UniProtKB/Swiss-Prot annotation:
A GO-annotated cellular component: plasma membrane
HAMAP family, A to Z: MntP_pump (MF_01521)
Gene Ontology molecular functions: manganese ion transmembrane transporter activity
Keyword Cell membrane: yes
Transmembrane segments: 35-55, 59-79, 105-125, 128-148, 164-184
Keyword NAD carried by entry: no
InterPro entries recorded: Mntp/YtaF (IPR003810), Put_MntP (IPR022929)
Residues in the signal sequence: none
Subcellular location: Cell inner membrane
Stated name of the protein: Putative manganese efflux pump MntP
Pfam family name, one: Mntp
Record-linked PANTHER family: MANGANESE EFFLUX PUMP MNTP-RELATED (PTHR35529:SF1)
Membrane topology (UniProt): Multi-pass membrane protein
Length: 184
């Protein structure tokens, strides 16, 4: 169980960081909307290893060779968009706006690509695959919800500077994924 918990927290850190950036961008997001986004992140992060496991049986070498590039491109693109918006205040959200589901989905996919790759190793957890997926999903849900709320508090106080930092944060997450895989 300890290994499952470590795996879940490790896979959830990208989702946490991305959710802080989303919270900064949309500081007045409702709890209900935050819970919906966290549920989406948790569900996708929990299912991603299963997808990786199933795909890995078919395309193990191909997926492993490119997953980090996809994650980097998605997260860097979202980060650059946030940086651009920080210099164009008219595009910043009003207090009532929330992220689009397309933006949430793109971020969730970008942060769950590593989890998909981890799915290739699910056999190491033996008969605990369903438990592993459940724990990953729950931990990601909780950390995403916390990240959205913390980001909202930061965003209310720092405005466009937080948007700029959030953009660099997403780029850093993507770059970390890329560098980690290229140097491994």
């Amino acid at each position: 169980m300890f290994q499952i918990a470590i795996l879940a927290f490790s896979l959830s850190t990208d989702a946490f960081a991305a959710s802080v950036a989303k919270g900064v961008r949309f500081p007045n997001m409702s709890w209900l909307r935050s819970a919906g986004i966290a549920l989406g992140f948790g569900t996708l992060e929990g299912l991603a290893p299963l997808i990786g496991y199933l795909l890995g049986k078919q395309f193990a070498g191909t997926i492993e060779g490119y997953d980090h590039w996809f994650a980097f491109i998605i997260l860097a693109g979202l980060g650059l968009r946030m940086i651009w918006r920080s210099f164009h205040p008219e595009t910043l959200s009003s207090p009532q706006m929330t992220p689009t589901w397309a933006a949430v989905l793109a971020t969730a996919v970008g942060t769950s690509i590593d989890a998909t790759a981890v799915g290739l190793t699910l056999a190491l957890f033996g008969d605990n695959i369903p438990l592993t997926l459940f724990v990953i999903g729950i931990v990601t849900f909780v950390l995403t919800l916390i990240g959205l709320r913390v980001g909202g508090l930061i965003g209310e106080r720092t405005g466009r500077w937080a948007e700029l930092a959030g953009g660099f944060g997403l780029i850093a997450i993507g770059a970390n994924i890329l560098v980690t895989h290229l140097t491994a």
